[in-house]
Structure formats: C-alpha cells, structure tokens
Amino acid sequence: MADPAGAGGEQEAPSVEAAFAGQPPPPWWQQVTVRAVAVSVVLGTLFSFMAMRTGLTAGFVPSFNMSASLLSFFIIKSWTRLMARCGVASQPFTRQENVVVQTCVISCATLSIYGGFTSYLLAMNETVAKAAGGGTDGRNVYTLHTGKIVAFLFLVTFSSLFCTLPLRNTMIVDYKLIYPSGSAVAGIVNSFHTPKGATKAKLQVNAMFKSVAGSFAWAFFQWFYTGGDGCGFHAFPLFGLEAYKEKFYFDFSASLVGVGMICPHLINFSMLLGSISSSGFIWPALQAKQGEWYTDPSPTSFKGINGYKVPMGVSMVLGDCLFQLGAITVKAVQHYRKGRQEQKLAVDGAADDGGGGCVPDDDDENKWHATYDERRRNQVFLSDGIPDQFAVAGYVALAALSTALVPRIFPQIRYHHVAVCYAVAPLLAFCNSYTSGLMDWSLATVYGKLAIFVVGASVGAASGGVIAGLAACGVMMVVIGDAAELMHDFKTAYLTLTSPVSMFASQAIGTALGCVVNPAVFLAFRWLAGAEHPPGDPRSAYAAPMAVAYRGIAVLGVEGVGTLPRHAIALCAACFAAAVFLDTAGAAARAARWRVGGWVPNPMAMAIPFFVGPTFAIDMCVGSLLLMAWRRADRQGAATLAVVVASGLICGEGLWTLPSAVLAMLKVQPPICMKFLSRSQIQEVRQHFVLGAADIQPAVTLTHHHHQ
C-alpha cells in the first residue's frame, strides 16, 4: 500500500474536478457579467477603504483575499435566490464568476498599497516632509492634484497588465509554480460551490456580520467619551502615565486588534520588541545626549533627534530588504536549476524505457485522476489564448505614453529616467513573479526602494531628487507588483477552470476601478483627518508610517549621510548589521528546523515603531493573544472563523469613521471627556468638581459637556 499521507495528497486533486464534471465552464463573456462588475464596484470600494485605513495607521496591510471571496459569493448567491423568489430568471452563479469578482475586488484594493497612497505619493507632500525632516525646499515637496493622481495611475497600472502576460503559460503550465495565495483562493472558491462549502460560507458570513456590528457599536460607544483633547478609551494609560508619554498605551482599537489577528504572530511581537527597544531604551539615551551630539531641539529636524530615528529605521528596512532580495534570488536560481535537471532526467529516463512502463503500486488510479485534472485544466487554460503580440504591443505603447507624460506630472523626473524604469521592469517583474510563485513573497517594494536611491541620486537635491526618486519608485512598484498579482490570479483561474481572457478582463476592470476609487477614498481620509492633522502628521489618526520611511529613504539617497548628526552613521550601520544578523539567524534556524526559527524577530516589523511609536504594536499584539487563546479553546472554530471575524473588526470601526465625520461636520460634540491624570494634576481637577472635592484622589476624570 502507498503511504496514507501521500495518498491523501493525491486524492485531493480528483475530488475537485470530479465534483464539477457536470458543470462545463461557460465562455469567458458569460463569466464577466454585469452583476459581477456591479458587486465588484461595491466590494472594491469597501476593501480599498479598509486596506488604505490599515496602511495609514499600522503600515502593514493584511491579505483580504478570503474575505473578498466570501463576500462576493454571499452577495451574488443572495441575489440569485432573491431573483428566483421573485420569479425572475437569472444566470446560474458559477465559481468562474466568483473568481472574476474576487479578482476585480483585490485588483482595486491592491492599488491602495501599490498606488502609493500610504507610501511614496503621500511622502511627496509637505506634511510628511516636515515629519521626516530634511529635503523640505520647494523642488523636493510636491502636492499632487487628484486629477494628476488618477492620470498617473492609469498610465502606470495598465502597463503592468501586459508586462508578464506572455509568460503565463510558462510560469503556470510548464514550471507548475505554486503561487500560494492564488492556490488558496482557488481552494476557497471551489469549496464554496459544493454543498458542504456553502454551509461553511454561510457560517462565516454570519460571524463576519456580527463582528462588523460589534466593532461599529464599540466605536460608537467610545465616541461618547472623547469630548476633548486626549480624552476617551483611545488614550488609556495601560502601562502608567510615564509610559503613556512615550506612546506606550492600549487605545482599544478594534480594527488594529483585527489586523493583529490576521498578521503573523512573529510580525506583531517583532513590532512590540522594536517598540520596547526604541522608545524604552534608544530614544531616552539619545535625548540625554542633546547638546553634546546634536543641538537642534526640534523633534522633526534631521539635525536633531529625528536625524537618528528615521535613518536608523530606514537602515533596518534596507538591511532586511537586501537580505531578502539576495536570499530569494539564490533560492529561485536553485529551484530553476533543479527543475531543469529533473526535466533532463525525465527525458533521459523516457528514452531509456522506450517511453513505456507502468507504476508498480496501487497509486495508479490516483495518478490517473491527477493527470485527468491537470489535462482538464491545461485544456481550458490554453484554449482561450491571448496573443503574445498583443501583450508586447500593449506594453510598448503604454511605456512610450508613460515616458512622455509622467515627467509632465512630476517635472522633477526626466524622460530617460522613466524610459529606463520601463526597460528594466519586465526583467525584474519576471524575477519577482517567479519568486512570488515559489514563496508568496513579492519584492516589488524592494525594487521600488532601490529606484529611489538610483534615480534620486542621479537627479540631485537641487533639482528635486526626492520627488524624482519617489516617482520612479511608483513606476517600479506598480509595474512589478501588479504583474506578480496577475500571475496569482492566473493560478486561481487555472485551478477553477476560469478563462484567462476573463481573468485579464477582470484585472483590467478592477484596475480601472481602482484608479478612480482609491483617489476618492484618499480624499475621504484627508477630509476625515481634517486640515489640522492631515494624513502623514505624527499627531494624526493616520500617521502613515511607511510614508515617513519612504521619505527618509529618498532624503538619504539625495542628501547623503554627511548631513546627519554626530554618531548617526555608526548607529545606522549597527541597525543595518542587526537586521542582516537577525535575518541570517532566522534563515539558519529554519533551515536547521530549530523550534526557535519561527520566533527570530523580523527586522522590517521592528523598524516600523521607529517612525510612528509603539501604540499600534500594543493593539496588534492583543490581537495575537486573542487568537492564541481562541485556538487553545477551539482550534477548529478559530481556523474557520478567525480571518472573517478579524476582517469584520477592521471593517466595523472603519465604517464608524463616516458617521463620526458627519457628526463633527454638524458640530455635534461628544458629551463626556474621560481623561487620565497624575496625582500632581489633582489640584487642577478639583477646581472643576463641587461635591467631595477634598476627598477626591482620582486617576481618571469624567467631565460632562453641557450644550446650551
């Protein structure tokens, strides 16, 4: 008998296409339906809002693939049932249409990240320039008009759809790359369209709606206690008032707790470690050196303490990025060489055997079924071809158009810089798509950061090198990142018998939707934040840590390290070395299968608190702890519902920002201020109380605001 584990792995494949044998896939034009596009508009806007809000607050954006698949299934399934009850005939809801909606939604939401609204575009404005310090002169500050943002996105994003399109058959059919995210989405969608999977989906939708309602109600309840500066649950000094001054407190944010439930525990606790090491030890030590190492007291100047904070964080980010780039490149080369050797051995073996032979154990039937599934998928995937000439012509035309027009949007960048970016992007996109297919890890942001250094340094500070570098980063990130996302979607299409043409069309629709929706969502966040503390301001609810990091990278690339305060270069070198050491230690431990390998801190996550402080790290660690407790109590329930409950927590609090903004616009103020005070402030508090003032020893004060 064959090994049971191995047999199970083989038997999983035939159960998929055998279950759908009586449901031939519809032609591609029946997969991209009007109702699919309509649902995509609604869900794309919702998930863009969630992704951008998370990026503006925490810096890390979790994957919403499962939630998008679930909600698209639920909405269209409910729609078809409603039409049936009303006696209106409607097209059957297929898994192919489900994949089309999911692809449109994620394509739209992904642009909130790759589009730069939480990173390189936001890093161009004056608010982030002041927060990061350095490079604040006129040529290195640029506030984009919404129309220019839309034009830039349309120019750059559509070229990414053509970049690696001719390689889809090579990557998926020939190399058989896994593309873990794409495969996972396919597994989810295939399961939804079976009776057992539909029951599970209904349970998950109910849990998500309850989570959304609970998160919204909690945010509404908290609003009543925010009647003043520093009031409410979001300023709860969990670790004491001294720690509160260093931003060590729990702010009861349901959305950040939800993000913590989705993000890996390693990321969350790495951020906590970075928070403790920076705010607890490094910053107090540097503050004690004021007057000796630096004299500028401004907290945002590169001549002051910010000349240590931002460059040290940037050094850790770059150390981690360069290590990952080298490590993944080595793995990709090894995997490619191994695959070529196996193909050669297979050809030689077939020649020696005369092309015949049979398998001498009882895995024959399973392998035949696996071959059937593979043949069926290959047949559908290869039947609807997109001509390679169309892809090449589309990329060349859009690259030429972008080369001519992007410098008109960003006058600081030259035509030849854009042309070089488009010339090298296909090669880097292939490398990124290949490695993403192996390890589900996109290096688009790494290539973008390298573009900042190269282009920024070539332009120079006097000519606006900061803006030029950030613009080049945008071109590289969007083209390379979206090209890898498209390959994940093609893998989903392959495993669900969805036509590649409909997949390309849904990507184009989602991309066009994202180019319009995301600028509008960003405008909404600017309106919600207000003119006093706009996005990117350290005091804003949307501090945008990655925008500060990208700005710091651009300033360092243009101005060099010679402008930094005393000993800053040595500290940056130490942070860079620490990042490389941690990555090396983690890789070695995982290779040796040591249990500690999964708990070596992640340098990228450790660096985030260097830019915005430790507050959100506390919330995300609470999310990890809640998930650990849930898994201990009910592992199966946590595996089924944790992601959707977390998505509901993120969505519910995010939805509350809209009515709260309307209340603020109508000048409706919260009635109560809940504030935490030290004993030294008691005398001031007593002046506002009449009864029992002599006996009051509070640590918390509740004050009612009366409206006349």
From Swiss-Prot:
Which GO MF terms does the UniProt record name?
oligopeptide transmembrane transporter activity
Q: Looking at the Swiss-Prot or TrEMBL record, what is one Pfam family this protein matches?
A: OPT
Q: Does the keyword Membrane apply?
A: yes
**Residues annotated as transmembrane:** 32-52, 56-76, 104-124, 147-167, 216-236, 256-276, 310-330, 390-410, 418-438, 450-470, 503-523, 568-588, 608-628, 638-658
Q: Where in the cell is it found?
A: Membrane
Q: Name one GO cellular component term.
A: membrane
UniProt superkingdom: Eukaryota
| This protein's UniProt keywords | Membrane, Transmembrane, Transmembrane helix, Transport
**How is it placed in the membrane, per its record?**
Multi-pass membrane protein
The family annotation for this protein states: Belongs to the YSL (TC 2.A.67.2) family.
**Which function does this protein serve?**
May be involved in the transport of nicotianamine-chelated metals.
Q: What is this protein called?
A: Probable metal-nicotianamine transporter YSL1
Q: Which organism is it from?
A: Oryza sativa subsp. japonica (Rice)
Underlying gene:
YSL1
